[in-house]
Amino acid sequence: GREIMRSLVEAARACPSIEVMEGAQALRLLQDGSGAVSGLLVRHGGQEHVLSAAETVLATGGIGGLYRVTTNPPEARGQGLGMALAAGALIADPEFVQFHPTAIDIGRDPAPLATEALRGEGATLIGRDGAPFMARHDPRGELAPRDVVARAIAAEIAAGRGAFLDCRSAIGAGFPDHFPTVFAACVAAGIDPRLQPIPVAPAAHYHMGGILTDLWGRTTLEGLSAVGECAATGAHGANRLASNSLLEAVVFADRIATRLREGASAARTAQPAPAPPELGAEGLQTLRAAMAADAGVARDRPGLMRLADTIAALEASYGPASEILAARALCQAALHREESRGGHARIDFPATKASAARSFLTLHDLG
């Protein structure tokens, strides 16, 4: 992934037909009289700019920044999803959020990861008393699926027993050589994983839902495509497999580029529009805490109703900011899905229904 990013940035900077606007913030999608997307309103250098485009491609990342503990950059907090909702796009499966079970719990934002490869090498999850606990939750132990391990760790933390990843016997002195990134994160926090267990906690990691697209990246709005984590291609179902998001981003980005290259869209001219409301820093912290408490690894109706009330209060104070719209979509879909499936776990509906069904909604459905 890092090498793909490096080479793409290098190629983009070298391409004379690409203008790079670093530090620009997308504010809203602009539309013509027919509802087709005609460009973007952005803020760059303290000024607002209208960017016209025959085709606008959203690649804004996920929603991890809507949660108090996340592995995502804090800037990735559902803005693309919210902008698409505000423009009338169809959203799919927003309730499905994957939580990485073993973020290193050292108070950093974003939280560094203790990779699953550590458990693959034999590291065990233990409580504060040093006793392993995964066998009590699932016969597959440390190698159970991500959502199962994340819920087990959350339950142990909620019960006051804590959760730690013990790598001392399985990896020991070889830690710095085999897992240098994790080792550096631990040492920076004053933890030597060769000698001490690593404190861990679940963290919002990947959003399986997003802006509905077809197999060529088209959304339900003319002139708008979406790719990467902000898109809902259906490729990940209810629970993404590790590393598949990289494959999805590469494949669907190439398909969008091929489509646009082979079938040039008609030129569009975007008209200026006012900037939408923005969620202030205090409101964002309130939302992140509420999302973590009530739409995390285990959900129930009382918690989701409490979250809906919090979101409504924030919208009354700040207006329909993109983050608020994204959170509303997730909360409503989670309330309506009365089952547990993949990254969506309802403790009041623990069974999985025999027939699978996707969730679809628009801004109109949010009321």
Feature-to-residue mapping (PLM):
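Alpha-helix capping and helix-loop boundary segments enriched in small/acidic/polar residues
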Residues: 48, 67-75, 109-113, 117, ...
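Glycine- and aromatic-enriched mobile tails/lids
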Residues: 32, 126-142, 152-153, 206-208, ...
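Feature captures the FAD/FMN-dependent oxidoreductase FAD-binding
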Residues: 1-44, 49-50
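Glycine-/small-residue-rich beta->alpha transition segments that form the dinucleotide
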Residues: 53-55, 59-64, 230
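FAD/FMN-dependent oxidoreductases across multiple families
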Residues: 180-224
